[in-house]
């Protein structure tokens, strides 16, 4: 670039820094403590995020033509998310002409006259702002709702992501110059230095394609991490894996080498379609077992190595008609509750300005509906909200470690109304303290245990539990069905009926039946150190 371009770039940088730092002066600083993300007091902060796209062709945060920016931020907060994984393209901060382009002109260049009118109506103060100022406005609006932001470098050239041949996949691809990428990371980290709710930087989304290799991953990801930390040492530095952010198996015997500590997080993506149609066509107990074993082998093992795992993308078709997605989600939620990892759902976006040549495309994975006015599927939102709750971690040792009995198909836990009433489901935050003894008894308050009753009967607590009818063990390939023998010797599994009562029934789907769905009988014992909340 010539000297004039360099001057414009420097002026742009200084102007944006000054405007950004007019917000709250003291930034929230997060760091890592073994596998946990913690605040300055050393208490766990669980990231319960939702992705918000700003990386497509228009380079305008999606949804601004549908609702006021403050309303979208309010929806995110009201749905229980404490964080947004905000997707951005490298060129937003490395191409001066793009960064200074106005929202109006960007939308106009794509022929999006209806979107222009929508932004004029819902966000008139943004329509003639630069693309970067619009991005800044989203961060600010989220901060006003106490929602944290992780800046996610999604692509280099603005576009929908992803394919092996889109030129955005790996270092050295046509749009993925490592030096330009590091320049972009550095600029973005500097631009948001001191902004109170910006807590982390995801260095790159879904590394992929024929050029991907381990040596270049180490070379450039370590350089990128060092650049971000140098520019803004308060940020968490979040590294993605290979194979569409699915594979960290190369870290089993080799460590990332950085000059700083306490900031490194690894991010993973996990969708049903990573395994084709296996969830729909296979035995769900077997598929869940195989998929979770594979995830442990290639990525989730990092938790045991003492690093936080941020599952920065997962999601399902919110219409509820995709059998593959529905079955996967129950297995995912069971794993997410058991491991209590940090996560980011794809996506808050209800519809796009312009995606892959289509104007106004609906996003069926979107938490919000097409006009961004409300949740697309409120029951699914409630179900996923169950894993927003942290079960344990630094600063959360409120009581002795115990178990909660989590039912992933509903996102609820087994609770008691009284010692004399049948067990039912309720919010996990209200669950009692369960203990699973070496003898496999599920006990509560010391003297009371869960007793197996005859098929179809309501379960309840008892003080007269024999070894045969109070020994509960995980069964099936998934290990997600809890089985015991009744006093008459019949094997039964816990199940939830249509009224959310806990009953016992004949164990389902133990054989190779592809059409069988065992989700009503799936339970998992989750470690917790939290006191029950009384409402």
Where are these regions (language model features)?
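Glycoside hydrolase catalytic-domain groove-lining segments
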Residues: 214, 218, 222-319, 337, ...
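Active-site mouth of glycoside hydrolases
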Residues: 32-236, 241-253, 368-371
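Short Gly/Pro-enriched loop/turn and capping motifs at secondary-structure junctions
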Residues: 315-319, 350-352, 487, 499-501
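Aromatic-rich peripheral "rim/lid" segments of glycoside hydrolase catalytic domains that contact
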Residues: 321-411, 429-430, 516-535
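Bacterial N-terminal signal peptides that target proteins for export
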Residues: 1-10
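N-terminal signal peptide
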Residues: 13-29
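Lectin-like carbohydrate-binding module/patch detector with strong preference for beta-trefoil
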Residues: 390-535
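A mature extracytoplasmic/lumenal domain signature
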Residues: 51, 88-90, 153, 270, ...
